């Protein structure tokens, strides 16, 4: 067993960087280097390790490539930092060279600027609220960051309330800050989430799967009975339906659908629709 | 005694404004250049060869919003919360509208016509509020256009 494990490790360490194009939708491991499409010009079986960056017309017309979560820039190449499947999105409006990212699975959330999250107010101190978002530090939320809030007109937020907001500052050096308004000053659905309902935690990958534009799960869930859901990118989901039983059923479905196949899901939904 | 010995004035004193009024423009320029030299010599700079900035074609972003088109996070089904349903429509179409190219807004009045109207409007309204003395400025040309307003005579501050 030790021998068999040793051989693949050696081959990985010795292999050259692969072209990103050939590895799309395949599993990549941390430490791998990927070449961008126009750097494969001189790539052949006898190609050397060092490839000088040629600033010819081809390189310049490529535009900016964005390396998303799970990837880092390493010279001219992309270095994989998380294990998962490599994905690529073509540029829509022609600017830039598209986006590469690694579709990985994790439960621990790291605050990212611009993400909409559900937080729990843990403390009120002076002019700010401390909100627990599941990261390493509680985020701070100023009381003026609500729609229509002024110094005299304070928002009605108590400890223990659920807040749906977005990050304006989120990096590894500073405490994350969140707000409940957008750049124009409008709430756009952010703010205190109402009474009742149930908050539960799922993996981050499931949230992204459920929020994908063509998600069948949500369409089927929406046909069951009237309900309201709020998704936070930090892995938290809040659901509310008319009765407690319906709310619990919904929570169970959403937690379980991560590991179910499409057939199993359809079976469960048909059983629910009958009852 | 006083005529023999010229009083030596310090450089700072000579640099003052009232001392420089008597100088010609040439000497003024020379003094300015000297001053600039002194200042630029005092500025610290790195004695390194010029480094060419490497233009990086790769941008790092940690957010999933760029990668995947995700829907808006608040949802309501079968009329449970009508406000949220309105928001859903608004936010999800906003995402799609950004992809679609903007269509030009149809105008009721074309730009050229607006420009023409304004040209004459400014003159006629201006005439209404101008005092009797100034009304002479608004003489009409042969074509009926208003001539441009002449510069008013204002008090000019005497130069040094």
UniProtKB/Swiss-Prot annotation, chain A:
Q: Which family does it belong to?
A: Belongs to the RRP40 family.
- Which terms are listed as keywords in the entry? Acetylation, Cytoplasm, Exosome, Isopeptide bond, Nucleus, RNA-binding, rRNA processing, Ubl conjugation
Here the cross-link named Glycyl lysine isopeptide (Lys-Gly) (interchain with G-Cter in SUMO2) sits at 151
Give Gene Ontology CC terms.
cytoplasmic exosome (RNase complex); cytosol; euchromatin; exosome (RNase complex); nuclear exosome (RNase complex); nucleolus; nucleoplasm
Question: What is the role of this chain?
Answer: Non-catalytic component of the RNA exosome complex which has 3'->5' exoribonuclease activity and participates in a multitude of cellular RNA processing and degradation events. In the nucleus, the RNA exosome complex is involved in proper maturation of stable RNA species such as rRNA, snRNA and snoRNA, in the elimination of RNA processing by-products and non-coding 'pervasive' transcripts, such as antisense RNA species and promoter-upstream transcripts (PROMPTs), and of mRNAs with processing defects, thereby limiting or excluding their export to the cytoplasm.
The UniProt entry lists the main location of this chain as cytoplasm
Named from the GO MF annotations, one term is: RNA binding
| Subunit structure, interactors included | Component of the RNA exosome core complex (Exo-9), composed of EXOSC1, EXOSC2, EXOSC3, EXOSC4, EXOSC5, EXOSC6, EXOSC7, EXOSC8 and EXOSC9; within the complex interacts with EXOSC5 and EXOSC9. The catalytically inactive RNA exosome core complex (Exo-9) associates with the catalytic subunit EXOSC10/RRP6. Exo-9 may associate with DIS3 to form the nucleolar exosome complex, or DIS3L to form the cytoplasmic exosome complex. Exo-9 is formed by a hexameric base ring consisting of the heterodimers EXOSC4-EXOSC9, EXOSC5-EXOSC8 and EXOSC6-EXOSC7, and a cap ring consisting of EXOSC1, EXOSC2 and EXOSC3.
- Its protein name is Exosome complex component RRP40
Please state where this protein is localized. Cytoplasm; Nucleus, Nucleolus; Nucleus
InterPro entries noted in UniProt = Exosome_RNA_bind1/RRP40/RRP4 (IPR026699), KH_dom_type_1 (IPR004088), KH_dom_type_1_sf (IPR036612), NA-bd_OB-fold (IPR012340), RRP40_KH-I (IPR049469), RRP40_N (IPR048541), Rrp40_S1 (IPR037319)
SUPFAM superfamilies, alphabetized? Eukaryotic type KH-domain (KH-domain type I) (SSF54791), Nucleic acid-binding proteins (SSF50249), Ribosomal L27 protein-like (SSF110324)
PTM annotation (N-acetylalanine): residues: 2
Q: Name one GO biological process term.
A: poly(A)-dependent snoRNA 3'-end processing
Origin organism is: Bos taurus
Give the matching CDD domains: KH-I_Rrp40 (cd22526), S1_Rrp40 (cd05790)
């Amino acid at each position: 067993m030790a021998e068999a494990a040793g051989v693949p490790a050696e081959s990985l360490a010795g292999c050259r960087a692969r072209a990103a194009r050939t590895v799309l939708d395949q599993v990549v491991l941390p430490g791998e280097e990927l070449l961008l499409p126009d750097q494969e010009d001189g790539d052949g079986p006898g190609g050397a390790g060092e490839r000088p960056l040629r600033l010819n017309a081809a390189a310049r017309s490529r535009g900016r490539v964005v390396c998303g979560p799970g990837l880092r820039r390493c010279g001219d190449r992309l270095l994989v930092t998380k294990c998962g499947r490599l994905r690529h999105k073509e540029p829509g409006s022609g600017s830039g060279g598209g986006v590469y990212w690694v579709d990985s699975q994790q439960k621990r959330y790291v605050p990212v600027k611009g993400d909409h999250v559900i937080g729990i107010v843990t403390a009120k101190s002076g002019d700010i609220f401390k909100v627990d978002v599941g990261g390493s530090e509680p985020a701070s939320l100023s009381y003026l960051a609500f729609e229509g809030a002024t110094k005299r007109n304070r928002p009605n937020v108590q400890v223990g309330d659920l807040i749906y907001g977005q990050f304006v500052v989120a990096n590894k050096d500073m405490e994350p800050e969140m707000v409940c308004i957008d750049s124009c000053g409008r709430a756009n659905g952010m703010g205190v989430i109402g009474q009742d309902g149930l908050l539960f935690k799922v993996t981050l990958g499931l949230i992204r799967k459920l929020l994908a534009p063509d998600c069948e799960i949500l369409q089927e869930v929406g046909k069951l009975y009237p309900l309201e859901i709020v998704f936070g990118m930090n892995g938290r989901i809040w659901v509310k339906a008319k009765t407690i039983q319906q709310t619990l059923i919904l929570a169970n479905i959403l937690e379980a659908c991560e590991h179910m196949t499409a057939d199993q899901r359809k079976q469960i939904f048909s059983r629910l629709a009958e009852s | 005694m006083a005529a023999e010995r010229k009083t030596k004035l310090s450089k700072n004193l000579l640099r003052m404004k009232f001392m420089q009024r008597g100088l010609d423009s040439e000497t003024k320029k020379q003094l300015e250049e000297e001053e600039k030299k002194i200042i630029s010599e005092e500025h610290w700079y790195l004695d390194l060869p010029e480094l060419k900035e490497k233009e990086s074609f790769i941008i790092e972003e940690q957010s999933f919003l760029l990668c995947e088109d995700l829907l808006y996070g608040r949802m309501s089904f079968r009329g449970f919360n009508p406000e949220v349903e309105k928001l859903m429509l608004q936010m999800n179409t906003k995402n799609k509208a950004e992809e679609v190219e903007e269509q030009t807004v149809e105008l009721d009045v074309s730009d050229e016509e607006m420009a023409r109207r304004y040209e004459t409007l400014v003159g006629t309204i201006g005439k209404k509020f101008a005092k009797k003395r100034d009304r002479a400025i608004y003489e009409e040309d042969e074509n009926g256009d208003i001539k441009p307003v002449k510069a008013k005579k204002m008090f000019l501050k005497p130069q040094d």
